[in-house]
Amino acid sequence: MLSEEIRQLFLEFFEKKGHKILPSASLIPDDPQLMFTVAGMVPFKPIFWGKVDPVYPRVTTCQKCIRTTDIENVGRTPRHHTFFEMLGNFSFGDYFKREAIEWAWEFVTQVLKIPEERLWISVYEEDEEAYDIWRKIGVSSNKIVKLGKEDNFWGPAGPTGPCGPDTEIFYDTGKEVPITDGKEPNPGNTEGRFVEIWNLVFTEYYQDENGQLLPLKRKNIDTGAGLERIAAMMQGVYYNFDTDLFLPIINRITDVLNVEYGRDEKHDVSIRVIADHIRALVFLISDGVFPSNEGRGYILRRILRRAARHGKMLGSEKPFLHNIVDAVVEKMGKIYPEIVEKQSFVKEIIYGEEERFLQNLNKGLDIVDKIVKETGGKIDGEAAFKLYDTYGFPLDILRDLANENGYILDEEGFNKYMEQQRKKAREAAGEVEFSERTDYETLDISTKFVGYDVLSTNARVLKIRTEKFVDEVKDVECELILDETPFYPEKGGQVADKGVIKGKNGEFVVTNVYVPVEGIIVHKGKLKGKIRVGDAIFASVDEKKRKATARNHTATHLLHAALRKVLGTHVRQAGSLVAPERLRFDFTHYAALTKEEIEKIEKMVNEKILEAIDVNTKVMSYDEAIKNGAMALFEEKYGDKVRVVRIRDFSEELCGGTHVKNTGEIGLFKIISESSVSAGVRRIEAITGFASLTYLENLETNWKKIKEELDATDENVFVKIEKLKEGIKQLELKIKEIQKNMINIKQILNNVQIENEIKYLVYEFEGVEQNTLRDLADKLIDRGVDLVVFFNKQGDKVILIVKRKKTFEKLHAGNIAKSLSKILDGGGGGRPDFAQAGGKDVSKINEAKSKLIEILREC
C-alpha cells in the first residue's frame, strides 16, 4: 500500500467518525516557545491548554513536522528523520479513552489489515482503565505490556501544565535482536524489533507547582501515528528509507551523483542523509524559513550544510542539492501545493547557499587538517568555535569528522564560546529567553491592548514576576502583567514600546514588552520603589519613540509595495526590523539591486509620502482580506480575524503593528544600504523622519569639508578630484619605474640554485608592484633559469609568483603555487607555465621554501 493511500484512508476513516479534516499547519508554529512544529498536536496547543475554545470538537490531520534533536542519527538508523508526517486524531472535551482505543484498533486491523498477532500494546502501569479497554476489544493479556512513567506518561511540557497517561501500538517486525531480561521479547525489553506506530495520549490531568496531578474539567485526546513508519510496515520493509516516500528521491540522488544505493553501507548512510534532509529543506523554505546564523534559519543552514557535506563524501565537488528538489515536489506536491508554488524559489535558495558553503567547507577542511597535524588529532573548543564563527563550519560536521577519523573534539569548550556569543547577541537584541517562561502558560488571565488608540492609560497590576511570581517587589528588575496596556509588544518585526509605569509608591521603567503566550502581554523593566499585585497604575508609552517606529513601519509597507512594482511580484518579505531609529527589510530576490533600481524604489516611496495618503486599518476575516488582495507574510500566523493596513491602492497587508495615520507624517524616506543576507535574500536598510534629516545634514557637513580640503566650489569640485586622480596615477607610474631600476637582475641571478638538475631561483620582495615582478620573472627565464619563485610581502600578507620555462614540462607552476600557498594559509593556482597565489601567514615563507625543495627532489 502506497503512502498516498495510507494518508487518504486515515483521514477518511476519522472523517466518517465525525472528525473535521484540517490541512497541515505551517512548520513555523504560532508559539514563541517552539522553534518548529514538532508534532501533530502543536497547532492545537492553545486548545489543550484551555486558552482557546475549539471550533470543532473532533479533528484529524496529516501534519508536517520537523525535529532535529537526533540529527546525527539520521541515515544511520531505520527510522530517524528531520522531516516527517504525523497522522493524528484529536478530541477536545468530546470522546475519550474507549473510542480512541477502539478506533485505533479498528483502523490498524480492519482498514490496514495488519494481522493481530503482529501487534503489541503498551499502557501506563497505573492506567487500569486503558488496560481493561484493550482486553475488552480482544487483545490478550500477554500482548499488553505495562510500562512506567518514562515510557507511557506524556507531559507536562514544562514544570506545570496538561498531562496524562498514554498507550502505544507496536508492530513486531520479527527481527532477531538481543533481549534485555531473558524473557519473551516484547516492546519493553527489546530494542529494534518492535516499532511504535501509534501513540494515544489521554490528557486528563493538570500538574501543579507541587507536582500534584489534578483532574481536568475537559479531557482531551491527542494521537500521533508516523506515516513513514506505517508505510514501512505496509510495504514490508525494515527501513523507512526503503518505502515509496523515499525511494524516488534516493533514485534521483544516485542519478545526479552517479553512485549506487545498496552496495556500500557508508555510501548508503550519506544517500539516506541527503534523502531525508532535502525533504526538510524543501518544506522549510516553502514555509518561509531562510538560511541565517540564528534561530530557524540556522537550523535550516545546518541541515543544508550537512547534506552538502555528505554529497562531497560521495564525490560531489559542486552544488547538487537543487537538482534533487524536483523529486520531492513530484512525490509530495499534490498533497502540499505550497512546495509546487515555491519550487523554483526553493531551488534558487538551495543552490546559492550550497555554493557558498562548499567554498567555505574546503577552506575549513584544510584548517582542520592543519590543526590535527599540529595537535596530534585534537581540536580544542576555541579552534572549533573559530571554524564555526569565521568559516561557517558547523559543529556536527566537526563531530562527524572526529568520529570518522578518531580525533578528540572539545565540544564542552566549543559550547562555552558559543554561549558567550549567544549571550552577547541576546543582550544586543533585547531577546527574551522564552524557554524559561513556561509558567506563564499556567495563568488564567489576559491583557487588553489599547495602544492603537491611546499612548497612556490607567490600569491594574495582575501579576509580578522575578524568578517566580510574587505579590510585592521593591527596587528590582522584574516583569509586570497589567489588565490593559498601551505598550505594543515586540512582534511582527516591530520592536517593543519603551516608557514608564507609575504607581502610588514606585516607578517602573519599561525596557521590553513581549507576549509569552497568546493573550498575555509582559512588561520587562526596572522598578524604583514598591509595587504590589492589585495596585492601580498609570502606564505611559514614550510618544517620541512610538511615532518614530510608526513612521518606519508604514515606510516598510511602502517599500515592500515599491519593491514588488520595480523588481517583480516574486518579491516577498523574508524578515524585518522596525525600530525608532531605522528600518531593515529582508526580501526574496536573486541579484543585487542596481543603482537605478534603488533610485527608482526610493523615489516611488517618497512620491507616496508627498501625496499624503491616509493609512486605513480595518479588522475582517482572514479569507475576506486575502480575497480583497491583502498580502499575508511568509512567517506570520493569522487567526480568524485579521487587521488589514491599507494605503489607498498602493499597499494592502495583514499587519498588527502601529502606523502613522497619513503617509505625509513619514517626512522623508532614505535607503542607506542594500546587501545580501543569504542566497536569494537581499536586505535594505533605510531611515525616515528626523533620522533622514540628520543623515542629510551629516552629508552636507562632509561635503563642505571636502570642498574646504580641495579649496573647491560646488561647480569645480569634481574637476579637482579628477586632477588629483591623474596626479596619483602619474606618481604610481614613476614608482613602478623606480622599482624596476632598483632591481638588479645580475645580483638576483647570483641566487640561482640547482636541485635535481633543475636551475631554480627563489627571491623575497616587499611591496613591489606585481606587474614589475612578472616582467622580471620573464627576463630571468630568458636568462636560462628553469623555475622562478617570488615571495612578495604586502604588510601581513604575501603574494606568490611562480614561473617556469615553457619547454620544462616536468614542472607545473599551478600545482607548485597551490602547494606553497596552502602552507602560507592561502590559496591560488594557474597554468602549467605561470601561476599566482596569496597567503595570510608571512612567517611561513621559509617553510614554503623547504616545501619547494621537496617538490623539486620528487620530480
From Swiss-Prot:
Name the record gives this protein: Alanine--tRNA ligase
Positions of disulphide bridges: none
Example of a GO MF term: zinc ion binding
NCBIfam families: alaS (TIGR00344)
Reactions this protein catalyses: tRNA(Ala) + L-alanine + ATP = L-alanyl-tRNA(Ala) + AMP + diphosphate
Cofactor note: Binds 1 zinc ion per subunit.
Domain note: Consists of three domains; the N-terminal catalytic domain, the editing domain and the C-terminal C-Ala domain. The editing domain removes incorrectly charged amino acids, while the C-Ala domain, along with tRNA(Ala), serves as a bridge to cooperatively bring together the editing and aminoacylation centers thus stimulating deacylation of misacylated tRNAs.
Keyword annotations: Aminoacyl-tRNA synthetase, ATP-binding, Cytoplasm, Ligase, Metal-binding, Nucleotide-binding, Protein biosynthesis, RNA-binding, tRNA-binding, Zinc
Residues that, per the record, bind Zn(2+): 553, 557, 655, 659
Cofactor(s), by name: Zn(2+)
EC identifiers of the protein: 6.1.1.7
Role, per record: Catalyzes the attachment of alanine to tRNA(Ala) in a two-step reaction: alanine is first activated by ATP to form Ala-AMP and then transferred to the acceptor end of tRNA(Ala). Also edits incorrectly charged Ser-tRNA(Ala) and Gly-tRNA(Ala) via its editing domain.
One GO term describing the cellular component: cytosol
PROSITE patterns xref list: AA_TRNA_LIGASE_II_ALA
Cell compartments where the protein resides: Cytoplasm
Family: Belongs to the class-II aminoacyl-tRNA synthetase family.
Root EC class: ligase
Cross-referenced PANTHER family: ALANINE--TRNA LIGASE, CYTOPLASMIC (PTHR11777:SF9), ALANYL-TRNA SYNTHETASE (PTHR11777)
GO terms of biological process kind: alanyl-tRNA aminoacylation
